[in-house]
């Protein structure tokens, strides 16, 4: 994976996964995103993500300068802890080894003990543990802002190999950040857009309307309309990820709000059950400000690529 080429576009075969998981994570879409966006990083601008989520896009891009915001303070504090050297690979390995052993011995009782502790203290180590030990890797908070996802029922989850995998992800994140001017900030998307300058590039990955929302991820039509209006005021390039179509319906918002943007489409499949018959397709849209999209014919220079991939939603 190329980590620094002066912006975009670039060709990568496969993106690396971050240490935390969340719904709608874009790991498999990163190569598609990188092929289609044009951004000249050498002008000194920042890569801005107002909806950081898992951080998978910026971590694979590894720009020199970035503003990374989210309303979920736990995501921001997690990456700040890595950036500031609190969560080193060695510290994470030691923590997960101990926590994994306790989970084996006490089962779900230990999981809920950690969950209660996290909801009191907000420890980034506990956040990582819960994210990897909870049901389906969900990240969900109740109306009081408390993590409320149940246990995954796998007390032997933290095997030596699994701990090594997570530790390596922490090491990779630390490496991608090192020497970079990245600002992680707990902030609304409005605050992030407000400080954008002409040489920046804004990548937007808002929650989907209709998908489960929680304390940190409430999103409705009014939010979408406000975002669409705010995007028009940006002084720089931007791109928006949004679902376009599945076998049941098409997202009418794209034609209604963003028909003037460059549209790039990625087709993938996901399973909703154990059999082949339950495999569904989905079209994902990348909507790019005119002048900042890589022409389709120019993408051949970046290398051939498959148009359809198997994609896990988690």
List where the protein language model places each region.
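Glycine/threonine-rich flexible loop motifs
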Residues: 212-218
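A residue-level signal for conserved active-site and pocket-lining positions in enzyme catalytic cores
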Residues: 53, 79, 128, 238, ...
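Long, positively charged, glycine-interspersed low-complexity recognition regions
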Residues: 220-314
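Conserved beta-strand segments of alpha/beta enzyme cores
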Residues: 65, 181-183, 262
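SAM-dependent nucleic-acid methyltransferase catalytic core
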Residues: 2-43, 85-203, 207-212
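Conserved S-adenosyl-L-methionine
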Residues: 36, 43-100
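Short, glycine/acidic-enriched loop or turn micro-motifs at the edges of active sites
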Residues: 52, 73, 191, 208, ...
């Amino acid at each position: 994976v190329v980590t620094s080429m002066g912006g975009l576009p670039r060709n990568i075969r496969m993106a690396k996964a971050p240490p935390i998981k969340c719904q709608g994570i874009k790991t498999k879409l990163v190569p598609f995103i990188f092929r289609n966006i044009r951004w000249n990083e050498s002008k000194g601008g920042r890569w801005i993500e107002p909806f950081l989520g898992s951080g998978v896009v910026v971590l694979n891009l590894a720009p020199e300068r970035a503003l990374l915001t989210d309303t979920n303070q736990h995501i921001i504090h997690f990456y700040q802890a890595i950036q500031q050297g609190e969560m080193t690979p060695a510290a994470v390995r030691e923590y997960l080894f101990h926590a994994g052993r306790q989970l084996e011995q006490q089962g779900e009782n230990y999981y809920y003990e950690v969950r209660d502790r996290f909801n009191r203290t907000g420890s980034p180590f506990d956040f990582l543990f819960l994210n990897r030990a909870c049901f389906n890797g969900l990240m969900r908070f109740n109306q009081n802002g408390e993590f409320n996802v149940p246990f995954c029922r796998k007390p032997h989850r933290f095997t030596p190999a699994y701990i090594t995998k997570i530790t390596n992800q922490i090491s990779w994140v630390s490496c991608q950040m090192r020497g970079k001017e990245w600002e992680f900030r707990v902030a609304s998307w409005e605050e992030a857009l407000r400080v954008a300058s002409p040489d920046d590039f804004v990548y937007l990955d808002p929650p989907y309307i209709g998908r489960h929302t929680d304390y940190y991820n409430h999103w409705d039509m009014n939010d979408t309309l406000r975002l669409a209006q705010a995007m028009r005021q940006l002084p720089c390039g931007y791109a928006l990820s949004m679902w376009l179509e599945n076998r049941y319906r098409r997202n009418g918002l794209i034609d209604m709000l963003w028909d003037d943007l460059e549209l790039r489409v990625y087709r993938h499949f996901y399973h909703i059950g154990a059999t082949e018959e339950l495999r569904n397709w989905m079209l994902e849209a990348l909507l790019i400000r005119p002048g900042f999209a890589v022409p389709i014919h120019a993408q051949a220079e970046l290398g051939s690529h498959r148009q359809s991939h198997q994609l896990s939603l988690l």
